[in-house]
């Protein structure tokens, strides 16, 4: 009777090790790989394809943002700059942005939200690398540490995200759409959104947490609708027509409307705060909201082991920390000298620096010394 009791813990430990082996082995089957890794690869091929689409899409977005940034810098150096929206370079950046977002859109159709949403950190780290290589920005120690943490977090996310394969059909979306879990979630989200919107509009509260929470609440609806629309389009392409169902167009309207208002609040945040503050906070809020939406609407973590969930959340934490380190203190350096250099103006010979307006404080007057200055001038005139 004692022997079976001793072997039970060994069986449990063996099962845990087998699960870890399946999670940590994601390359193609080969001579050195066992049957577990081969089965894991075949079972998760479509997820890995979604991961590849998301990573490539985020990298393309990084390239597009740096191209647009370079076009702005290039136009600023011209004597008579034309509007940026007429620049071929800037327009090519916009097209690349659309291409990258298309990759993300397709990724949501073939992989879980909880796997694709956190991969947005690749856009931030990729943008930092491109800025160093092509825009000659400084590479800091915090950048290297942040990139390392982001890559480590991505590795854990890919391995420990929920291994579920869902065919997102119109009937499936309808079933989840009227489920009590989603209805409770939507009611709570609407209440929080209305309260924050009241304080934002009526009380003039423009704190970054308020603005980006509004963005995150809308983003949860965006990722739910994006996955539904993308999944139904994917099934329709394979021959199972889903575009005749009303739920497809309902989700399409939700996707467009949530995106529009999301951009509106995000623009308000970028106008009031620096990008080094907005980018990491928005990444954390958006990813958290998307993960919660995927868990509640699509039930992506249903039946997952505690260890798997814990390591997945730890991977999210590493990616969040990496984004904060990469974007930390990346504000533009401002010139400390208050003068205008005439050396680059055609037909003008530079003799000295032109001082600022004599009425300004930087001209040498004290903030409260206007009366004393005028008094001294008056004494000189009387004498």
UniProtKB/Swiss-Prot annotation:
The keyword Membrane belongs to this UniProt entry's keyword annotation: yes
Keyword Electron transport: no
Any Pfam family the entry gives: Mg_trans_NIPA
Localization in the cell: Membrane
Gene Ontology terms for molecular function: magnesium ion transmembrane transporter activity
Family of the protein in this entry: Belongs to the NIPA family.
PANTHER family (alphabetical): NIPA-LIKE PROTEIN 2, PTHR12570
Protein name, per record: NIPA-like protein 2
Species this protein is from: Mus musculus
Gene this protein is translated from: Nipal2
